[in-house]
A protein has these predicted regions:
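Acidic/polar, low-complexity intrinsically disordered N-terminal segments immediately downstream
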Residues: 12-233
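C-terminal motif of bacterial Sec signal peptides marking the signal peptidase cleavage site
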Residues: 6-9
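Mature secreted bioactive peptide module from preproproteins
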Residues: 211-362
Length: 362
């Protein structure tokens, strides 16, 4: 469906090869067969696998790829659901999916395998499975859950290295290495300085190297009086329903420097089976709505111009996501803002039915 997208030009391929030669490093490149503008390579970043970082021509292409992968996931899931009997129970659905090898992460795994790439998604999946193995029935610690990484979204995690790194071709003249520290702090390495990248991978920041830029975006301090509009929100919280449990993940992010602008709601489903908690396929819902769940939410461009949106997904899945990306709006880049009682993060599973005001989230 998405094959044959825009290819990286020969000039860019030659440029990357020339830059590698200048650094006395011959790096093999593997081009994606799913998205021809993406390449995977191996650098000395401490991650031992065939290819440990991806190359995108721009940040915009990276976020476009995340959106397209989400569309592919939805398509594959809908195709499987079309073969499933109506009114099937969650347990029977789970058994049928396992029997035929269906999984909502199959598209992401195919993308990683195609590039022989070990992603952040794969790393967190392994850590989360180990963490869930030791969880009991009491309250879970959100700070210890590997899934509560600052990159909330599994699809986006698929595009970053296990160390939250990526290479972006910002101009025709150079490629830039980025290591994300959190939503608003990162390190850049210019001029393809592989020694600087190696140092950063072991925790040493070469601050006297002109090729290295440390970016620290100072966010506004928490005001003493309430603000009218908020542009940055992030929360993860668990909710229990007998032998089932869900996690609410709600986020508003506006980072103009590397283009992450969106509002999202994710619901993760867990179920206890054979004495162990695991992510399980259950009927779960995630949405970005108005107060009733069926009406539109009201969002704000740069906390000024109001516009309405409504997105709800309900599926038998381990996780369900609703996302509104900040694209161009009336000629300007969309900065999403939320105001009181205008936009709600909607999460449902069984008797758990939550509509939570983004503005009031702590």
């Amino acid at each position: 469906m998405f094959f044959g997208l825009m290819a990286v030009s020969c000039d860019k391929e030659e440029l990357l090869q020339e830059q590698n030669i200048k650094n006395d490093s011959s790096i093999a490149q593997k081009q994606s067969s799913m998205f021809s503008y993406i390449q995977s390579i191996k650098i000395n970043n401490g991650v031992d696998c065939e290819n440990n970082i991806l190359v995108f021509p721009s940040w915009e292409k990276l976020w476009d790829t995340a959106d397209k992968l989400d569309e592919m996931i939805d398509y594959e899931c809908d195709m499987f659901d079309a073969t499933v009997p109506n009114n099937i129970t969650d347990d029977d659905y789970d058994a049928l999916a396992d029997a035929v090898g269906f999984d909502e992460d199959n598209v992401l795994r195919a993308f990683e395998n195609d590039l022989a790439f070990c992603s952040l998604r794969r790393k967190i999946e392994r850590l989360e499975n180990d963490w869930l193995e030791i969880q009991g029935d009491g309250e879970w610690n959100t700070n210890e859950d590997p899934d509560n990484h600052f990159i909330f979204d599994e699809t986006e995690r698929t595009l970053f290295s296990a160390n939250t790194e990526v290479i972006i071709g910002e101009t025709e003249a150079e490629y830039v290495y980025y290591k994300l520290i959190d939503d608003f702090n990162w390190i850049e390495v210019h001029n393809w300085d592989l020694e600087a990248i190696r140092q950063i991978s072991i925790g040493v920041i070469p601050i006297n190297n002109s090729n290295v830029i440390v970016q620290n975006i100072v966010m506004d301090e928490v005001p003493e009086t309430p603000v009218e509009c908020k542009k940055h929100i992030k929360i993860a919280k668990y909710h229990v329903n007998g032998s089932n449990r869900i996690k609410q993940k709600s986020k508003v992010i506006n980072n103009s420097w590397w283009g992450a602008k969106k509002i999202s709601a994710l619901t993760v489903g867990y179920k206890k089976k054979n004495g162990k908690w695991k992510r399980r396929r259950t009927t779960i819902t995630a949405g970005i709505t108005g107060v009733s769940g069926t009406n539109n939410c009201v969002l704000y461009q740069k906390c000024g111009i109001a516009f309405e949106k409504h997105k709800v997904k309900e599926r038998k899945r381990r996780r369900v996501k609703a996302k509104i990306r900040g694209h161009k709006y009336k000629g300007e880049s969309l900065i999403i803002g939320v105001k009181p009682q205008k936009a709600y993060s909607y999460h449902k599973q069984g008797s758990i039915n939550l509509k939570l005001d983004y503005y009031d989230m702590q």
